[in-house]
Curated annotation (Swiss-Prot):
Catalyzes the reversible adenylation of nicotinate mononucleotide (NaMN) to nicotinic acid adenine dinucleotide (NaAD). InterPro entries: Cyt_trans-like, NadD/NMNAT, Rossmann-like_a/b/a_fold. Keywords: ATP-binding, NAD, Nucleotide-binding, Nucleotidyltransferase, Pyridine nucleotide biosynthesis, Transferase. GO terms for biological process: NAD biosynthetic process. Signal peptide: none annotated. Pathway: Cofactor biosynthesis; NAD(+) biosynthesis; deamido-NAD(+) from nicotinate D-ribonucleotide: step 1/1. This is Probable nicotinate-nucleotide adenylyltransferase. Belongs to the NadD family. The gene is nadD.
Length: 218
């Protein structure tokens, strides 16, 4: 049973398509920091990357299929960003979530190392720790340093190695997890489908079946 102050983590992305590179590191992260709930936040209009190939409803369907296959029931979905016609700015979403969950509930946003390195380029990106913790999953080829020394000092003030601290305050900390680094990307999977190459082992079988049935990424 979930306590009233249990840490709730959100994981955003286009999920075009959702794959094991999304899921397995987050499952490992959940074990490291004792997450009882991870809520996927599919983007509608991502402001920092090309627009998705699959429609919002197709990406939502693939996410549902993927989490239904997982043995751990911690994953759920939040469709709010798919219902916005405007860009999916994370800070706007977390301002709304903070109002909903209240000032004392621990909230976290899961990102990859690549996203941490570009956080200063996000819309009000450095304001996020005022609203939530940041949980950072390792990514191949990236480190944890920011380009600017002042930004590195900003990062250092918020870093924690104590997973329990994430449960004891509502926001403000950055936890960098040594999760498994998987060289799986949605762009590579889309290219494989275009070129007729196999994608076995890269994404859940039910998602593969959906892609085939819908004729996606051809």
């Amino acid at each position: 049973m979930m306590s009233e102050r249990a840490l709730t983590a959100f994981y955003g992305g286009t999920f075009d398509p959702i794959h094991y590179g999304h899921l397995r590191p987050v499952i490992a992260l959940a074990r490291l920091v004792n997450l009882q709930r991870v809520i996927l936040l599919p983007n509608n209009v991502p402001p920092h990357r090309p627009q998705p190939v699959a429609s919002a409803q197709q990406r939502l369907a693939m996410a549902r299929l993927a989490i239904a296959e997982l043995p751990d029931p911690i994953f759920t979905l939040d469709e709010r960003e798919l219902q916005r016609p405007t860009p999916s700015y994370t800070v706007d979403t977390f301002e709304a979530l903070r109002r909903e969950y209240g000032p004392d509930s621990p909230l976290a946003f899961i990102i990859g190392q690549d996203s941490l390195l570009t956080l200063t380029q996000w819309h009000r990106g450095l304001e996020l720790p005022a609203l939530c913790h940041l949980l950072v999953c390792a990514r191949p080829g990236y480190d944890y340093g920011l380009a600017d020394e002042r930004d590195n000092r900003w990062l250092a003030r918020r870093l924690t190695r104590d997973p329990q601290a994430l449960h004891q305050q509502p926001a403000g900390l950055i936890y960098c997890a040594a999760t498994q680094q998987l060289a799986i990307s949605a762009s590579d999977i889309r290219a494989r489908y275009r070129e007729g190459r196999a994608c076995d082992g890269l994404l859940p079988p039910s998602v593969q079946g959906y892609i085939d049935a819908q004729g996606l990424y051809r």
